[in-house]
A protein has these predicted regions:
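Hydrophobic faces of well-ordered beta-strands that scaffold small-molecule active sites
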Residues: 5-9, 59-61, 87-92, 117-121, ...
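Active-site mouth loops of central-metabolism enzymes
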Residues: 11-42, 92-100, 141, 183-196, ...
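Flexible, glycine-rich active-site loops centered on histidine and acidic residues
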Residues: 2-38, 95-164, 210-226
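N-terminal small/glycine-rich loop or linker at the start of catalytic domains
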Residues: 1-34, 126-129, 168-186, 263-293
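Acidic (Asp/Glu)-rich catalytic clusters
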Residues: 49-53, 76-85, 106, 110-117, ...
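Glycine-rich, proline-tolerant flexible connector loops at the mouths of alpha/beta enzymes
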Residues: 58-79, 213-224, 319-329
Length: 349
């Protein structure tokens, strides 16, 4: 099996069911006691080092400027340097970040962890954050044009000795990035979009597409039909351009004696550590993600992973309860069997 597996670096925005994250939210509001360590960062180190050991391939460092979350670039740089195989996927918001600065940050991180960094372009985001941090909120086609310019400038600076660009949103005159990425192939660009224009943007500009399905989907069969249609549509678009785009998915993965048991255990763990959790996060992000078919018995999950790979997916960026024990269990029950020589036995369960 060639499927790659990823997970989210644990930060308050992206994590549920974690006592360390619950503590980090309170801890972030005040100075640390002398000698104390930040709970959020320590969980990230422990979790991703365990994930590195059991075969995970990628970690997404999401960015939430208005919140208790650590800055993605700082968090990624501090943790990725301790890992051996995991690639750091760092989120960036055009409109809040300057492309020249991001090009330098990316080149720096790529030299610290050669070939193990990529950029997740977030084209649409939380308006309140943009307003608070002085960003410019754009809509529709304007937003895509800005993002395309942003990416073109980064790639130009990585590639050329001297690079100039004069666009609608950015201008660079005789720009020089004297620190180049470590590898000849520049850092890859990931993004997500569901609109027709957004899909064209992915095909024209990005290397990876996070495929989404309707959050209103009520069954795994409905999700699979939606994913199949989306990939068929994108395959037709890439065939017209000749560009290769890789496909990724964000399912929630939870182990249990059945799908119902896995979901029940997950919900209990969430409420055990936070009696008043972010219900929006659960209802809009976690519960729909469980319908991708990756909860339940390990053998059933392994078979679903194989179906997703057969459909064309190359990466599963897993949503999960962020604990070292859970990560190790997923490595032992899902990743290792699928990558072993005994693939037939792994799928048979």
């Amino acid at each position: 099996m060639t499927m790659k597996f990823g997970l989210y670096a644990p930060i308050p925005m992206a994590a549920v069911g974690s006592p360390e994250i619950a503590a980090a939210v309170t801890q972030a509001l005040q100075p640390l006691p002398t000698g104390a360590k930040d709970a959020q960062f320590e969980l990230g180190v422990d979790l991703l080092m365990a994930a590195d050991e059991v075969g995970f391939d990628l970690a997404l460092f999401a960015e939430r400027h208005l919140g208790h979350d650590m800055a993605a670039w700082v968090n990624a740089s501090a943790i990725a340097s301790r890992l051996k195989r995991i690639r750091a996927l760092v989120a960036v918001h055009p409109g809040l970040w300057d492309p020249v600065m991001v090009a330098k940050l990316a080149a720096s991180l790529d030299r610290i962890v050669p070939g193990r960094m990529a950029i997740n372009i977030v084209n649409g985001w939380f308006d309140q954050e943009f307003e608070m941090f002085g960003g410019k909120v754009l809509q529709g086609e304007d937003r895509y044009r800005r993002t395309i310019e942003f990416i073109e400038i980064m790639r130009g600076l990585w590639r050329e000795e001297t690079f100039s660009f004069h666009g609608e949103h950015y201008n660079v005159t005789d720009g020089q990035l004297l620190l180049k990425p470590a590898t000849p192939t520049p850092p890859e660009i990931f993004s997500v979009s569901t609109s027709d224009r957004g899909r064209d943007f992915i095909v024209e500009t990005c290397d990876w597409w996070f495929v989404e399905f309707p959050k209103t989907a009520e069954s795994t069969d409905e999700v699979m039909r939606s994913l199949e249609a989306s990939i068929a549509d994108m395959n037709a678009r890439t065939a017209r351009t000749g560009r290769k785009v890789h496909y990724a998915l964000n399912p929630f993965l939870a182990l249990g004696s059945s799908a119902e048991d896995a979901l029940d255990q997950t919900v209990k763990q969430i409420f055990a550590y936070d009696p008043d959790p972010d219900t929006r996060k659960i209802e809009r992000r976690m519960i729909p993600a469980t319908r991708a078919g990756c909860i339940g018995k390990p053998a059933d999950i392994r078979r679903q992973v194989q179906r997703l790979e057969d459909m064309g997916f190359e990466l599963l960026l897993l949503k999960l309860i962020p604990s070292v024990e859970n990560v190790r269990a997923i490595g032992a029950e899902i990743i290792a069997p699928l990558r072993s020589g005994a693939k037939a036995e792994a799928l048979a369960g």
